[in-house]
Design a protein with these regions (language model features):
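An acidic, glycine-rich surface segment that forms the CoA-thioester-binding/catalytic face
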Residues: 182
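N-terminal secretory/targeting leader peptides
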Residues: 24-26, 46, 79-176, 187-380
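Short, low-complexity disordered leader/linker segments with a strong preference
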Residues: 1-87
């Protein structure tokens, strides 16, 4: 019995000891040594290139579209219409060899060139189309599209017409040109408004010689009975001074002097007269600007033809005529400087007109103009 109790006690002690050991705190573990630094990581190896992707399979070809119907052929363009060319017959009033027609020969070439092919002007000398000095009638009737002449040849139509080319004792060339551009042309067109002629400009030149003669002129008495070719207001004054005045076209003067039909003439300036060879048939050339201090020569157009001309060509003709006027004045100024000594070299006496002749003409002219102005409002 005692043995069983003892065995039970020993079992209880053993179980208690085991429980105590299980419940006692565990000793703290020794600190772990610091870990060694980690070695630097080796560089990562470059990745192997990715294998090239397999080529995509070629797409199946799209079915070809049905061909579009061929377009109808475009109609052939109409042939270009040729630019209109304005053909012009233009006449001067003097012979082909005269300085004025020679000037126009060159001037027409310039106009045709400036027109760029739209102008085709053909020049004619005085008498070739219309009778010489009747160029106005030729333009009025449409025989000529253009013409140039002297207004004094129209005295049979208008008493005031002579005032536009020149007046005895009147304006100098530059003054006459300025007056023509500003007042003269409008007045001239007003005077002839009932006709088929329009003035678009004018050419100006130097003073004329007073007279060329086969006979000496020493006093105003020598004018009386003299057979002289003259035109315009100068002719009227010579008549009032007692001369026997005839009107001849420029191309007939040489022969009339040569044959004795006339004793003297007034044509134009020494440079112009030289081109008509008057040095062969005169003995004296008398100089003075009083009889004709300038010469303004209108440039005329046929109104019906002018109405068909485009504004661009109208402007070209008008503006180039202004330039041509000054060019001709310059040309003839130089020609006079050459001609006067040339006349002397041919044996012609080149002299100033005697003062009493010059004064007599100026006095008669002043009275004449006053008388006509009192009669005719337009003349005034």
């Amino acid at each position: 019995m005692k043995g069983k109790i003892f065995s039970i006690l020993m079992a209880v002690v053993l179980i208690g000891a085991l429980i105590a050991i299980g419940c006692a705190p565990k000793p703290a573990p020794a600190p772990a040594p610091a870990p060694a630094p980690a070695p630097a990581p080796a560089p990562a190896p470059k990745p192997a290139p990715a294998p090239a992707p397999a080529p995509a399979p070629a797409p199946a070809p799209a079915p070809a579209p049905a061909p579009a119907p061929a377009p109808a052929p475009a109609p052939a363009p109409a042939p270009a219409q040729p630019a209109k060319v304005y053909k012009v017959k233009l006449s001067t009033h003097v012979p082909a060899a005269s300085a004025y027609t020679v000037f126009w020969t060159d001037f027409v070439k310039q106009l045709n060139t400036a027109g760029g092919g739209a102008l085709d002007i053909t020049l004619f000398a005085g008498g070739a189309v219309a009778p010489a000095t009747k160029e106005f009638d030729g333009v009025d009737q449409g025989i000529l599209e253009m013409g140039t002449t002297c207004t004094m040849y129209w005295l049979d139509k208008w008493l005031a017409s002579g005032l536009f080319t020149y007046t005895v004792g009147g304006l100098s060339p530059s003054e006459a040109m300025m007056w023509g551009m500003n007042e003269g042309i409008p007045l001239l067109n007003e005077m002839m408004k009932a006709t088929n002629v329009e003035i678009i400009g004018g050419i100006i030149t130097v003073p004329e010689a007073f007279m060329s003669s086969k006979k000496a002129i020493n006093t105003k008495a020598d004018i009386r009975g003299l057979k002289i070719r003259a035109a315009g207001d100068g002719g009227i004054m010579f008549s009032k001074m007692g001369a026997s005045v005839v009107m001849l076209p420029g191309g007939e003067i040489y022969e009339a002097l040569q044959r004795g039909v006339i004793d003297a003439c007034e044509i134009s300036s020494p440079g112009f007269d030289w081109t008509l060879a008057t040095y062969e048939v005169i003995k004296y050339m008398y100089l003075s600007p009083v009889r004709q201090p300038c010469e303004w020569l209108p440039v005329m157009v046929n109104k019906k033809w002018w109405a068909t001309v485009p504004d661009s060509l109208k402007m070209l003709l008008i503006e180039m005529t202004k330039g041509g006027a000054w060019n001709y004045l310059n040309k003839m100024s130089k020609a006079d400087v050459v001609a006067i000594p040339a006349y002397k070299a041919k044996g012609v006496q080149v002299l100033p007109i005697p003062k009493d002749v010059e004064n007599e003409m100026a006095t008669i002219a002043a009275a004449y103009y006053s008388e006509q102005a009192a009669k005719d409002a337009f003349f005034k």
